[in-house]
Amino acid sequence: MTDNTRLRIAMQKSGRLSDDSRELLARCGIKINLHTQRLIAMAENMPIDILRVRDDDIPGLVMDGVVDLGIIGENVLEEELLNRRAQGEDPRYFTLRRLDFGGCRLSLATPVDEAWDGPLSLNGKRIATSYPHLLKRYLDQKGISFKSCLLNGSVEVAPRAGLADAICDLVSTGATLEANGLREVEVIYRSKACLIQRDGEMEESKQQLIDKLLTRIQGVIQARESKYIMMHAPTDRLDEVIALLPGAERPTILPLAGDQQRVAMHMVSSETLFWETMEKLKALGASSILVLPIEKMME
């Protein structure tokens, strides 16, 4: 990490965002061996170093200028931002873009056998959480006083252990809450992964590499959200067919040999294609409908 000409990116070593971050970098064409236990991994084909750390260390590494970029959950980023502001600091960074993975929600949960009449039910209660600043901001806005019980793991066991009356924790399916006799009652923050950049002057070569990386990330995300569609469509109902398939551009229309009533239609659709949509296309007279994934995309 002593070569300042190389772009330094921090990502989670293991956990919820690790696999998705690896896949994103790979699909952007960055060749890195991330299967070892090394803290630092060097790209084989670009001047990029990957620093693999705990997720809650990533915001600080970016804010302190130790690394150039970080892939991090917005919940962790916002918690660290509030923490530093509470200590009188003025943390600086740029959010380059939101990513299409790492979705979760930070929610309040209470024992299933307790009545819930809104956030006021928590007035004067003790709440266990790993996100004390996000929790405080939310309940302060509601004018609710509470006592915080800071836990760095296994937050969901706090009520049964007598440590707290309720919890504030990340929720995905709710199965863990249910297994511990809890129910989700209020979402206080919704989060996805994001790409952030340190504040301060950036070397021109690094900035050019960041711009290239952003273009590739945009292409990867667009490809994931799009499908390449081919079909035969009746010429007298083309407008209705196109209306069912919002796309980045107008479709390509090709004549069919020996068929004046239909054409071949090719297009990239930004709309997730459900069975219902395909059934509507068929009802309009479309046939030979093919829906294909897109590996890479650049407009």
UniProtKB/Swiss-Prot annotation:
UniProt-annotated location(s): Cytoplasm
Gene Ontology CC annotation, any one: cytoplasm
Activity regulation: Feedback inhibited by histidine.
Keyword Transmembrane helix (UniProt): no
Biological process per Gene Ontology, one example term: L-histidine biosynthetic process
Catalytically driven reaction(s): 1-(5-phospho-beta-D-ribosyl)-ATP + diphosphate = 5-phospho-alpha-D-ribose 1-diphosphate + ATP
Superkingdom of origin organism: Bacteria
Pathway(s) of this molecule: Amino-acid biosynthesis; L-histidine biosynthesis; L-histidine from 5-phospho-alpha-D-ribose 1-diphosphate: step 1/9
Function as written in the Swiss-Prot or TrEMBL entry: Catalyzes the condensation of ATP and 5-phosphoribose 1-diphosphate to form N'-(5'-phosphoribosyl)-ATP (PR-ATP). Has a crucial role in the pathway because the rate of histidine biosynthesis seems to be controlled primarily by regulation of HisG enzymatic activity.
The name this protein goes by in its record: ATP phosphoribosyltransferase
Gene source species: Escherichia fergusonii (strain ATCC 35469 / DSM 13698 / CCUG 18766 / IAM 14443 / JCM 21226 / LMG 7866 / NBRC 102419 / NCTC 12128 / CDC 0568-73)
